[in-house]
């Protein structure tokens, strides 16, 4: 992309698409490396489908640019939903993982470490873990499920199943006592 005449928003999105760290740093320099201005640009810049720079980094596996964005001091929105299907960057990462399992799992782990919420559902009522298909993605499934459990236990809602489903984890202690009688 020829950046001459391109807005900072367009340059940011292009840097995310192409994993172009030099372009990203040029954009940040144009904003005097001001964390508030950078965060505002990152949070408000969207392509026509509503994908942010975070979505694009996750879609194309642009780790260097994503890492630099996640390291910013400003208030970066980590779970924005795109306009088309309501996917968060974590949803997009799971889709990317179908083609690049190791790299996608690495990106997902880093998103979760900075606060991405694996419980967010898209417009099809799917959490990121619901998008996983394939035998080689067991590590990703474990990561997403573990992150959900960690959030639920931290919030004190580990006993509350969001969907209202009963989870059968085998015989209860009461059943075992009945069997002994």
UniProtKB/Swiss-Prot annotation:
- Phosphoprotein: present as a keyword of the record? yes
- Which Pfam families would you find in this protein's record? Ank_2
Specify where the region named Disordered lies, as residue ranges.
151-181
Gene3D superfamilies (UniProt xref): Ankyrin repeat-containing domain
Q: Which SUPFAM superfamilies match?
A: Ankyrin repeat (SSF48403)
Which residues, renumbered to this chain, carry the PTM Phosphoserine?
172
Modified residues annotated as N-acetylmethionine in this record: 1
Note the segments forming the ANK repeats. Answer: 49-78, 85-120
| Composition-biased stretches (Acidic residues) | 160-181
> Can you cite an annotated GO cellular component?
cytoplasm
Write down the InterPro entries for this protein, in alphabetical order.
Ank_repeat_dom-contain_49, Ankyrin_rpt, Ankyrin_rpt-contain_sf
Keyword set, alphabetical order = Acetylation, ANK repeat, Phosphoprotein, Repeat
Q: Could you tell me which SMART domains the record lists for this protein?
A: ANK
> Taxonomically, which superkingdom?
Eukaryota
Q: What is this protein called?
A: Ankyrin repeat-containing protein YGL242C
Q: Which organism is it from?
A: Saccharomyces cerevisiae (strain ATCC 204508 / S288c)
């Amino acid at each position: 992309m020829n950046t001459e005449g391109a807005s900072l928003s367009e340059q940011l999105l292009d840097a995310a698409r192409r994993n172009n760290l030099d372009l990203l740093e040029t954009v940040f320099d144009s904003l005097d490396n001001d964390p508030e201005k950078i965060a505002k640009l990152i949070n408000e810049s969207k392509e026509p489908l509503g994908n942010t720079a975070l979505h694009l980094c996750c879609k194309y596996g642009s780790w260097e640019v994503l890492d630099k964005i996640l390291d910013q001091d400003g208030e970066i929105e980590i779970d924005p939903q795109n306009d088309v299907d309501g996917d968060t960057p974590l949803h997009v990462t799971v889709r990317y993982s179908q083609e690049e399992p190791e790299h996608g799992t690495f990106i997902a782990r880093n998103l979760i470490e900075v606060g991405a919420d694996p419980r967010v559902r898209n417009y099809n009522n799917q959490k990121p873990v619901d998008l996983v298909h394939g035998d080689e993605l067991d590590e990703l499934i474990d990561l997403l499920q573990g992150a959900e459990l960690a959030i639920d236990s931290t919030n004190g809602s580990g006993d509350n199943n969001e969907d209202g489903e009963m989870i059968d984890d085998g015989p209860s202690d009461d059943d075992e006592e009945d069997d002994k009688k």
